[in-house]
């Protein structure tokens, strides 16, 4: 299977390398399924799948409703992890290698990497990944609908408006000599 798009996302100490390939709709993080790697954390799963949701043209109801019960939550998890669709749509495998940082830093690095890869996928000039050859893209919702790839500027604008292409440059401040931590000093004694 040919790699359609590659991108890198960073957040704090985490670095995520994202590859999008033709396949059968798998979402793999460090050789594990996304749900297993992210420990079934609902926020992390939503954040990782968010760039795909932006591409969805259908206006769906909010996934988190006030009457959210355990069964609704379980069905939402299964909907998040299913990549199913029509016969004429193209399925993509998303393969991520991530290291460094904690779970939330890795989640945000993966989200940035996926967003960048989707932008590259839409602007790719490779004949095997041309818009004419890949007419539809899978949305990771269990509804079974596929989305026609709009032009690159539309995808970029949608992702940029949601803030998924903006890299968060905040990192931990270095420790200074003479201090306990970056800014914490030992207790001051006047006498």
From Swiss-Prot:
Does Ribosomal protein appear among the keywords?
yes
Gene Ontology biological process: translation
Q: Where in the cell is it found?
A: Plastid, Chloroplast
> InterPro entries of this UniProt entry?
Ribosomal_Su5_D2-typ_SF, Ribosomal_uS9, Ribosomal_uS9_CS, Ribsml_uS5_D2-typ_fold_subgr
Question: Disordered: where is this region?
Answer: 166-191
Q: Name one GO molecular function term.
A: structural constituent of ribosome
Q: Which Pfam families match?
A: Ribosomal_S9
> What ranges does the record list as Basic residues composition bias?
172-191
Q: Which UniProt keywords apply?
A: Chloroplast, Plastid, Ribonucleoprotein, Ribosomal protein
SUPFAM superfamilies associated with the record = Ribosomal protein S5 domain 2-like
Gene3D superfamilies attached to this UniProt entry: 3.30.230.10
A GO cellular component term found in this entry reads: small ribosomal subunit
Please name the PROSITE patterns in this protein's record.
RIBOSOMAL_S9 (PS00360)
Q: Which domain of life is it from?
A: Eukaryota
Would you identify the family this protein belongs to, as annotated? Belongs to the universal ribosomal protein uS9 family.
PANTHER family per the record? RIBOSOMAL PROTEIN S9, SMALL RIBOSOMAL SUBUNIT PROTEIN US9M
By what name is this protein known?
Small ribosomal subunit protein uS9c
Organism expressing this protein natively: Chlamydomonas reinhardtii
């Amino acid at each position: 299977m040919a790699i359609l798009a590659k991108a890198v996302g960073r957040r704090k100490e985490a670095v995520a390398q994202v590859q999008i390939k033709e396949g059968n709709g798998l979402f793999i993080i460090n050789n594990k399924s996304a749900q297993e790697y992210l420990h079934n954390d609902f926020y992390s799963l939503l954040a990782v799948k968010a760039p795909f949701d932006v591409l969805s043209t259908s206006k769906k109801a909010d996934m988190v409703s006030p009457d959210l019960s355990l069964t609704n939550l379980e069905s939402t998890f299964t909907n998040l992890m299913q990549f199913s669709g029509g016969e004429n749509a193209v399925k993509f495998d998303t393969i991520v290698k991530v290291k460094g940082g904690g779970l939330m830093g890795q989640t945000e690095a993966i989200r940035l990497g996926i967003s960048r890869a989707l932008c590259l996928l839409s602007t790719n000039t490779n004949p095997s990944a041309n818009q004419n050859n890949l007419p539809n893209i899978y949305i990771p919702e269990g509804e079974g609908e596929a989305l026609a790839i709009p032009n690159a500027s539309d995808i970029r604008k949608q992702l940029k408006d949601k803030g998924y292409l903006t890299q968060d440059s905040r990192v931990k401040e270095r420790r200074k000599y003479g201090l306990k931590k970056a800014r914490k000093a030992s207790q001051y004694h006047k006498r």
